Amino acid sequence: MSRFFRGDSSSESSSDEEEDLYSDDEEVQEQPEEESEEDDSEEDDDDDDSDSSSDDGVGKKTGANAFLKDDSDSDSESSGDEGVKVVKSAKNKRFEELEATAKAIENGEKINDWGSISAEFDKLNRQVAKLLQSGTTPKVYIKALAELEDFMNETLAKQKVTPKKMNATNSRGLNAVKQKLKKTSKEHQKDIDSFRADKDAYMESEDEEVVAPKPKKAKSSAAAQNLVIDGDDDEGWGTVGKGGRTLQFTPESILKHLRTILESRGKKNTDRNEQIKIMEKLYEVAATPYQRIRVLLTLISTRFDMTTGTQTFMSQEQWKAAEKEFATLLSVVETNREFVVVETAEPWEDDEKLPTVADGEKFKIPGSIVSFVERLDDELTRSLQHIDPHTAEYIERLSDESDLYNNIVRTMLYQEEISKDESLTEPQRSLNRVVMRRLEHVYFKPSAVIKILDENCWKAIPAELDSTITPRGSVQDAKTLVNILCNYLYINTEGEGLTKARAMLCQIYFEALHDNYYKARDMMLMSHLQETINSFDVHSQILFNRTLVQVGLCAFRAGLVYEAQTTLQEICGSGRQKELLAQGVMIQRYNQVTPDQERLEKQRQLPFHMHINLELLECVYLTCSMLLEIPLFAQTGSSPDIKKRIISKTYRRMLEYHERQIFTGPPENTRDHVMQASKALAQGEWKKATDYIHSIKIWELMSKPEEIKAMLSAQIQEEGLRTYLFTYAPYYDTLSVNRLSSMFELPDRKVAAIVSKMISHEELAAALDQVNSSIIFRKGVELSRLQSLALSLSDKASGLIESNERTLETRTQGTANAFERQGGRGGRGGNRGGRGGNRGGRGGISNAPRQAGGTQFTGGALGAAVGSRA
């Protein structure tokens, strides 16, 4: 009969049903029987007493007591012998699997197959892990460890003597077993020593330990069911623990339960979800503020323990639950001022009674409110790092920042209150940490956003709470708030150079973001952070890079092209903007870094809403480089005497690559627009260059795009004028200022000012005739095209000679008289072989025969030509 249709409701029937279920789970092995015999055996099982349930059930017959049988039962008994149920308990089955694995290891030892030994050893460790949960270490396992260790030592000893090496598979298997066995043997060293001392005595009691009392387990399951029912009928809180024990939650037992949870913290096989449920019930039955504070402190810590992996992040549900519980904790400690949570407090050891607090005194509870809010902040950041920023989920997750900011401000108010009480000896560093967190949440935001965020925060904070650092209603704008927070950190961070430096970088970033270039520049220069930033941590270096870039963008918005280019040069010229600004990892560098370094770099990435637009950054950098490099190209082309200098190697490489292209189509991206504009500006077509620059759509991302475009037009006109004068000055005797003014659509006064500046800086060999409003160029200063090419050839020839001299010196190191030539031809200068000397120099006369071979590095085609002319 199926067990679902039995009408018997007695406890014995219930236990037998549990036994049948357990037997099914443990793979019941039975021989075929007739249906009538199965019915008889099941009816007999119903009448079986509890004593029979204590047997192991392996190879036993099931049925009624032998003394209660009549003669008619003999036939059924004899027929029942033919189909006996063989029931193996879970523990017995695992022991058999363990013995089979140990036997497989022995077989691998016989054929010296370390590959199979390694695989079976891993399997053995997995199997024994399940058995260790229910009792002591199996002695079969200890025996296998000891014998495997002996065989491994024997094999290693043979390898030292035998010159023949193992194959690669065996060698890898041996090394793997060696490492794993070393770790495993330490954990069971005592048992291994006992086994080696007396193997027979150690293995005697093994059979008794192998037998697993299956029916008792079924009975305990039935008892657990009864306890669950009893617990449900009870009025108080109760839950079922291990072994079916009912846990009763009362206010008196809260501290004991918390101690149990704290002791199990960090251990393996700890069900944190179950602990969280228990603590939620404990909070509901908590009767005093002290109990609530203790439960909340432990509960929040346990929630954070659920995400200890480096690649995982706290789920939104868990984060919101932790944030809500943290807000509740703040409310409790704000209401009950006699209890304070500080890091320096001693734990309360007596779980039987609650602490009593006298009037006017304060009781310290160990904990850290600041660490909790920092962890909430870090978990939110990690969550934003892993979410796709182009989805609605990111926006939804970002909305949690306002709740976090409210908790940060409330934590700051609480720490201010604690720091006023000198008896608590709370370090100033804790308050500085939370002030720094508040500053880091506002420094990169626009003023309007900060104002709304701060106003909503004070509305959510209870009216009786106020701050001494930023009093309620005193902060009218974002700039005042940032200045107050930064000044507080400047004053109260003695011995905390890193915190002070980060506060200064945040303030510089804020000033640059709001177009206060000169103040941001002066603060950056006066701080001297560029001299010590290499000694700071990576996060501070990233903040420094972000601040430097923001100062450069601020200079560009102010029309200071040279300052913007020099500021952005270090970041944009490296080609590693993503890494330096923590906005991504360069793909081509994956093969150059270890997985740990790559993981750390990904952990340092900033959330998407804090990113600086890299395309805009590149556009600004290339535009500034164009406005500086194109006039410099024209100047060096017409005046070779000027020392060649490179402002931006990155820009020059891009420009050279663009010029090498045979066919250039219309510009498609930002870089193409700048390159086309550069080409037009070099040809004097400033209007065309302006059109290319204005057609870049990235300018729309700036705060005032029309003003930016107007500024760029003026800059292109001025640099176009300079480029024109540098390029075509050799072809003019005089040039009217009015003509230049009409060509470049600039006022006469502006043209005269630009020309005067060029003349005063000795960039242009000319004079300005203010009476006739014209420019008079001086002749003989500029070189012709032939002269320029001759000078270029001379420079290359001298460079070739110096290169050959260095090569010869490298090859003849340590050789005496290496530079002494036969016939008195020596080095440069002097009476022997020098330039202009009497013998053998350039232009000199020498009657000595030339030596054949490669030791003479002067001469060649150029030397022969000089010699023939001489």
UniProtKB/Swiss-Prot annotation:
GO terms for biological process: formation of cytoplasmic translation initiation complex; translational initiation. It is found in: Cytoplasm. Residues 608-782 form the PCI domain. GO terms for molecular function: RNA binding; translation initiation factor activity; translation initiation factor binding. The keyword tRNA-binding does not apply. Keywords: Cytoplasm, Initiation factor, Protein biosynthesis. Residues 1-92, 807-870 are annotated as: Disordered. Signal peptide: none annotated. PROSITE patterns: PCI. SUPFAM superfamilies: Winged helix' DNA-binding domain (SSF46785). Residues 14-54 have a biased composition (Acidic residues). One of its GO terms (cellular component) is eukaryotic translation initiation factor 3 complex, eIF3m. Residues 824-844 have a biased composition (Gly residues). Component of the eukaryotic translation initiation factor 3 (eIF-3) complex. HAMAP family: eIF3c. Component of the eukaryotic translation initiation factor 3 (eIF-3) complex, which is involved in protein synthesis of a specialized repertoire of mRNAs and, together with other initiation factors, stimulates binding of mRNA and methionyl-tRNAi to the 40S ribosome. The eIF-3 complex specifically targets and initiates translation of a subset of mRNAs involved in cell proliferation. This is Eukaryotic translation initiation factor 3 subunit C. It comes from Sclerotinia sclerotiorum (strain ATCC 18683 / 1980 / Ss-1) (White mold). The lineage of its organism: Eukaryota, Fungi, Dikarya, Ascomycota, Pezizomycotina.
